[in-house]
A protein has these predicted regions:
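Active-site-adjacent substrate-binding region
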Residues: 232, 329, 337-458
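Second-shell loop/turn segments in exported
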Residues: 7-15, 34-44, 115, 137-143, ...
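C-terminal non-catalytic alpha-helical accessory regions
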Residues: 433, 443-681
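Noncatalytic luminal/extracellular "stalk/propeptide" segments of secretory-pathway proteins
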Residues: 2-3, 10, 17-18, 22-25, ...
């Protein structure tokens, strides 16, 4: 790569971290809830903030600054206030957070508030909650998401559910509230309460429970206004620095919707991408590729009653508003929570195809003292936590500053404590400088520096050949075809490297653009062929879901043969989403299964086609839970054998699919290789 170090250093010197910080704080002005904040999808607060960012981009000197209109389900959360009276008659008033659901009281209304533990199906036995508020504790990191107990309460006739974080999120202080995407229907209302207020409420419940009732209960007044409006609109804000040589683009992205104040998530990131662009313009940098700055709306949530209800703004942008970006954007640098050190080691998380290039850049970085004592590393593949996943599956190679690990997520994330108090100036400064340099390193290249071999290697490393032999799947042929594709990928990678090393004055940019479009086409096909999700939204290869199911089924069958029911049931927990069959009633389990398997594709968003198979063990779980020592298990053993046979067929199908995918990828890779020897026609 050829980077003019003088111009790089000049641009770095033009960075103004205080300016970025001030913009991040300025983004807090518009809010849907005057007490708690929130800048939610499709709300007036979000749109006004978008208008402000539009003007900021213009002031920074970006050109072609536009508002791209996108479809979303809008959420307006204005208030949620609860009142109760203690033994002395003093009125206690508390603020609640909310989820993306419908609940309007039109002023204070009286409700009975009942405490039901974790809100599982068993907690409701012989309990009438019709028209009542149900109070529960939840750990969304280690147990289940909010949608399960919320929908369970709704089916039981509860007026609404109120969740308190027992562990997992918002652990920084007992006064912390938490917010997440609901991943459920808007007709099942949900709110959040701080642990401090919960402890006060529980004490009042105990004091008033003079008759020793089994279920703690308290009369409260509640005033709430939260509403989901289907099929609304909002805007993504786009500005450009035009390229001088290439028709392709490099994207800087971050989202501008938020929970609470959202200083880290994601005000600081939006301010940073504008700050980097401003520094390039002040430094007089003339990019070879057009640099696009995009402030995305509706990342936290943007569509009702789907598992894939976040990253809506990014999905609408690249699949609907600007589908032409696919095939022309050579990299997306996405940002989340960039003004805080999430670990003792910093990291860039990227797609497989960019991993070698990013690692080479990261390894050469001189780390500043005092903020990341363990240095910096490269992680891959990308995860579904942020917009970069959506970008990747659209055909745009993406990366993000790694943020998903570390104590911030458990303590501050999506709480009112994500504010300026967690600002770390030296971290923010380092990320401005590092990603400006990385951006210019990518811009210095004629071709995107992708290597398709790493993803192919990963698919084979995840393959269990012993299981292939047990199930009759043709793993040997898959190995052979994948090795052929890897060899072709290695040749192509070297051709790309050599082309990028051509002196700038001798580059054929017309040829580079033609090859780039083909390279990005291969990348998109690789995403289509090789990227799947499990039921916990983890990124996996196509055969891994069934492979893991077969491991668990084998364990379970072994235990049942020995008459050991408890460990057999424990093995079921890792089979697709069957862990929820243990805690919630049938209708809950089926709703959140079928809204993935049977919902229309346009509502599955970035999760469309990423989960293929499902093994439904709900009835088997119910039967085994009722078994007593000495009961026959023959019917249950037979059910497990049938499940094993189904999964064997799925596995063989998945391996056959991967064989065809490897052949197709090899052919596509070879087509691009041929372009290096030919003209651009």
């Amino acid at each position: 790569m050829t980077v003019n170090l003088n111009i790089v250093e000049k641009c770095v010197s033009c960075l103004n971290i205080k300016e970025s910080y001030d913009l991040a704080r300025h983004m807090e002005q518009e809010k849907t809830n005057p007490v708690l904040g929130y800048r939610t999808a499709g709300s007036l607060a979000e749109r006004k903030t978008g208008d402000m960012l539009l003007e900021e981009m213009k002031k920074a000197g970006l050109t072609q600054v536009e508002k791209d209109k996108i479809r979303v389900d809008a959420w307006k959360f204005k208030k949620a206030v609860m009142r109760c009276h203690d033994r002395e008659g003093t009125c206690r008033e508390i603020q609640l957070g909310a989820y993306q659901t419908d609940f309007k009281t039109n002023g204070f209304q009286r409700f009975d508030l009942v405490y039901l533990g974790k809100g599982t199906a068993d907690e409701y036995k012989d309990i009438d909650v019709k028209g009542k508020l149900v109070l529960i504790e939840i750990n969304q990191r280690e147990e289940w998401w909010i949608n399960y107990p919320v929908y369970q309460a709704h089916l039981k006739g509860a007026a609404a559910l109120i969740a308190v974080q027992s562990r997992g999120y918002a652990q920084i202080d007992d006064t912390a509230l938490n917010a997440q995407d609901i991943a459920g229907p808007s007709c099942a209302p949900a709110f959040s309460m701080s642990r401090a207020d919960f402890l006060m409420i529980r004490q009042l419940m105990e004091e008033k429970n003079e008759n020793g009732n089994r279920v703690p209960e308290l009369s409260v007044e509640f005033d709430a206004d939260t509403e989901v409006l289907k099929d609304q609109y909002t805007y993504n804000i786009v500005g450009k620095i035009p390229g001088t040589d290439s028709d392709s683009m490099i994207l800087l992205s971050a989202h501008y919707d938020s929970y609470f104040e959202g200083f880290q998530d994601d005000n600081a990131a939006v301010a940073m991408i504008i700050g980097i662009a401003r520094a390039l313009l002040r430094g007089g940098y003339k990019p070879r590729h057009t640099i696009v700055v995009c402030a995305l709306a509706a990342e936290e949530w943007g569509i009702s009653d789907t598992k894939y209800d976040w990253s809506t703004g990014a999905y609408r942008q690249v699949f609907e508003a600007r589908p032409e970006w696919s095939g022309h954007v050579i990299a997306d640098l996405n940002f989340e929570l960039p003004a805080h050190a999430h670990s003792t080691r910093d990291a860039v998380r990227c797609t497989y195809e960019y991993a070698d290039f990013v690692r080479g850049f990261v390894d050469a970085v001189q780390m500043p003292k005092g903020i990341y004592p363990e240095g910096m590393t490269t992680l891959y593949p990308i995860e579904t936590w942020s917009d970069d996943f959506t970008m990747a599956i659209s055909g745009i190679p993406s990366m993000v500053n790694d943020f998903s690990g570390g104590p911030f997520m458990e303590n501050y994330y999506h709480s009112q404590y994500d504010n300026q108090d967690v600002y770390e100036e030296e971290v923010y400064k380092f990320h401005h400088e590092f990603y400006l340099r990385l951006l210019l390193a990518i811009d210095s290249l004629a071709l995107p520096p992708m290597d398709f071999g790493r993803a192919l290697a990963g698919s084979i490393e995840s393959l269990d050949l012993d299981l292939c032999m047990q199930t009759g799947a043709n793993g040997v042929l898959l190995l052979e075809k994948t090795e052929e594709a890897k060899k072709a990928a290695a040749i192509l990678s070297e051709q790309v490297r050599r082309f990028n090393s051509i002196p700038e004055e001798k580059r054929d940019w017309k040829k580079a653009d033609a090859i780039t479009e083909k390279l990005l086409g291969v990348f998109r096909k690789s995403q289509d062929y090789l990227v799947r999700l499990d039921w916990d939204d983890n990124v996996i290869f196509p055969q891994q879901a069934v492979q893991n199911n077969l491991y668990a089924l084998k364990k379970a069958m072994g235990y049942l043969e020995k008459g050991e029911i408890a460990p057999a049931l424990e093995a079921f927990y890792s089979i697709d989403n069957n862990c929820y069959a243990f805690q919630f009633e049938r209708e809950v389990f089926y709703h959140f299964t079928e809204y993935i398997l049977k919902q229309s594709p346009d509502r599955l968003m970035w999760g469309k086609g990423r989960i293929i198979h499902h093994e439904n063990l709900y009835d088997l779980v119910e039967r085994l839970k009722e078994k007593k020592p000495g009961d026959s298990l023959e019917a249950e053993k037979q059910s497990l054998k049938e499940a094993w046979e189904r999964q064997k067929r799925y596995y063989a199908d998945d391996i056959e699919y991967l064989i065809r995918a490897a052949e197709k990828l090899r052919n596509l890779i070879c087509e691009v290789s041929d372009m290096f020897e030919k003209g651009t026609e």
